[in-house]
Each structure stands twice: as C-alpha cells, then as structure tokens.
Design a protein with these regions (language model features):
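Cytochrome P450
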Residues: 2-365
Length: 365
C-alpha cells in the first residue's frame, strides 16, 4: 500500500548550489542576519535599510558549521513581489518554508524536521491549489459569522478579566489566550484538551530558546556545545505527545468527520491519495504552532506599536473606522513572519542579479 506523497523524502537528498554568478553589489554589510543577537530586542531595521540601499540582492554567508551554501537576501519590495509571483521559477516545494538551511543530519529531530517540511505551504502549483481548494468549503459565510460572534465574546471575557488588574502581562493574559481559543474552535478541539495546546506551544518556544543559546555558542567557536540531556528527554516526550494527539484526532476526524477544519484536513487528498502520516503531522504542526504564533505576535506587536506611537493611538481610539488600516499596518510593521524562502529552479535574474539553478533565496519582509 502506498504511503502517500511525502515531500520531505524528496527534499532531503536535493542538493543546493553555491552561487553560479558573481554578486552585482560588491558590499560588506555591517551585520549578519544569522546573528541571533540582532533579533533579541526587535528586528534590525537599520541593517535592513543598509542592505536595501546598498545591496538589495545580497549573498549571505551560511552559519558556522552549516553544511549548506549561503543564500541570497532580498530586501526590496519589487524584487520580493517578483519572486513571490513566479512560482514556476522560484519554488516553495524545494525551499522548506522559512528554513534557511536543513542543517546537518545528526541535528535533525526525527518528527519535527519532517513535519516542518510536509505541509501545504511547501507545495507548488496544482498540488498546493488543490489542497487549498479542499479546505476552502469549510469557511462558509455562515460559519465565519458564527465564529466572529464567539471570538467577540471571548475578547470581552478576556478584557473583563484584566480590567481589575490595572496592569498585566498582555502576552500571557490576552495575546496567548485568544489565538488558542480561536484555533480550538476552528479545529474542533474539545474544551478539556485546549490547555494542552498552550503547554505544547510554551515548550516549543522554550526549545527555540535553548537552540538559540546553542547556536550562539557555536557562532562563538564553541564546537562542543550540547544541550542538557534531561531537557532533550523532556522535549522529545512532549513532541511525541503532541504528534500522537494530532494523529489520533485527525484519524478520528477521517473516520467520523464533523463541521470543523480538522475534518477537512483529515479527508483532503494529494494526487488522489489520502494525506500520509507525515503530512498529517506537518498539517497539525502548521496549524497549532504557525497559526497561533503569528496571530499572537501580531496582537502583541500591534499594542506595542500603539504604545510607542501615542498620537496614532489617540487617532485610533477616537475613530474606529481607522481599524482596518491599523491592522494592515500592524502586519506590515510587525512582520510576524520575518522571512520566507524560495529555491531557484532555473538560471534566472532578479533586480539585475543573475542567479543559477537550485540556489537559496530568502525574501526578507
């Protein structure tokens, strides 16, 4: 019996090339985008500006100990738009979402590695469109209106809870809670299981912190840096629990579908076949982590923007008709997804820079 389509199996052995052509812009940037210290206090806008003005298409060196070549960094709107609008030249399928490198094989987590690749965002062309089409009938106007009412009531509940506090940790009390609630409603997660999603997200974020510390030490030349074994065991147990639950609930939705997004995902097909276990894992991770993380960061970042720009805050308070524009500006300024990656499929040119086949391209938002 066929296991179904597994993108990660194709990606793992796919070679990435070093630049085939010389850089158009002979420029040495003042900082490195793979220096994670740059992002600990917000985005390095001054570095973005420097690159945009001096080398809008810039070849960035890989991180220390990275077995893959570096990547082209694009920072101009028109160049990013051009690459995004030409998927037959610039592939998502051979680009692994926002992963700038697959890293060395020994450092890949057996489940997380594949699940970050095997999902809808990393599909090209008809496979991507067909999978999206299978999800869309779920978002009917009646359902969306009902969801809006539920979310509105939840917002009121959260605000009522923090009002007596005077001040609070907005991320923990509101920004973290609302996306989890909304996702759980969309996905059909039982009330008694919803706190599990919060715990899994906190643990995944904690793991990112430990990874950051390890990469930081490697960048400083400490090649023997390794994480705490007890932390690894705890993390692996959490990952197993998260994916076991995801597979359980998705396979249950496959047998007994209901009016929720998980049922649509569980019964979707790629090239006529049910989604493989790897794609179920990837879809599950994409929804509960990426869907939650981006919404939470946008909400938190939006409040910080208003705090840092009091005049704009007063304008919005006095005229809620400005809210749609504020939401769009928040997404633009906060950039909850900082970059996405593509891979060139053929020899091509972007902004006057020649690029060879199978080179990495990072669209920096």
């Amino acid at each position: 019996m066929s296991r179904g389509f597994i993108l990660s199996d194709e990606i793992i052995d796919h070679e990435i090339n070093s630049p085939a052509f010389e850089e158009k812009h002979n420029f040495d940037a003042s900082g490195k985008l793979n220096d994670l210290e740059l992002f600990t206090k917000g985005q390095p806008f001054s570095l973005y500006k420097e690159l945009r003005e001096n080398a809008p298409i810039y070849f960035h060196d890989p991180m220390p100990m990275d077995p893959e070549p570096g990547y082209w960094v694009l920072t101009k709107y028109e160049d990013i738009k051009y690459v995004s609008m030409n998927p037959k030249i610039f592939s998502s399928q051979y680009a692994t979402g926002n992963m700038l490198t697959l890293g060395s094989e020994e450092n890949r987590h057996p489940k997380l590695f594949k699940s970050t690749i095997d999902h809808m965002l990393n599909l090209d062309g008809e496979m991507h469109l067909n999978l999206r089409k299978e999800h869309m009938p779920f978002f009917k106007p009646g359902y969306v209106d009902e969801l809006k009412q539920k979310v509105s009531l939840k917002v009121t509940e959260l605000l009522d809870q923090i009002a007596p506090m005077g001040e609070c940790n907005l991320v923990k009390e509101v920004s973290q809670q609302l996306p989890i609630y909304t996702l759980s409603e969309i996905l059909g997660i039982p009330d008694e299981d919803r706190q599990k999603l919060v715990s899994w997200m906190e643990f995944l974020e904690l793991a990112q912190y430990f990874t950051y510390e390890m990469i930081k030490e490697q960048n400083e030349g400490k090649t023997d840096s390794t994480p705490d074994p007890a932390m690894i065991d705890m993390f692996n147990a959490m990952v197993d629990e998260m994916f076991d639950y995801g597979r359980f609930i998705l396979k249950n939705k496959r047998k007994n579908p209901s009016n929720d997004l998980l049922s649509a995902i569980a019964n979707a097909k790629i090239e006529g076949q049910e989604l493989s276990d790897e794609f179920l894992d990837g879809s599950w991770l994409l929804i509960i982590f990426a869907g939650n993380d981006t919404t939470r960061n946008t909400m938190s970042g939006g409040i910080k923007l208003l705090h840092d720009n009091q005049y704009q805050k007063e304008l919005l308070i006095n005229n809620f008709d400005l809210l749609p524009g504020f939401i769009n500006e928040t997404i633009r300024c906060v950039s909850p997804v900082i970059h996405m990656r593509r891979t060139s499929l053929i020899e091509t040119e972007v902004g006057g820079q020649k690029i060879g086949p199978y080179e990495k391209i990072a669209l920096w938002y």
